[in-house]
């Protein structure tokens, strides 16, 4: 079971249709995206990586299995891009990383999504808990890195 499938299982258990991931380390872990300025939506209908036009080519290269969404195409608004993804995917209850979302950003997103009858629910440590337990591949890669460093 890969990390996205694990996240989907957790979402299902919490009654969520999808999750909006904003913490840079979590975005990288779940998508493979190596840079900053990106956000991820995971839901059963698909995986989305939101970034701007400077990074879409990089995102397409590093994030197979993700639809890359250029937020510049949505009035240069990340919340509007998120709203579009939720509408497209049929998300009615969206989790978000409450510890990594500013109140200002929450209010802006909540205003848009609530107008579409989409509920936002704060989540904690969904991706972090996956990051704590290392897969065999992650352990092997760490060993290789240690050998190279020696």
What are these regions (language model features)?
Residues 77-150:
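Flexible, acidic/His-enriched mid-domain "rim/lid" segments that flank
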Residues 22-24, 51-53, 72, 96-101:
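Structural motif
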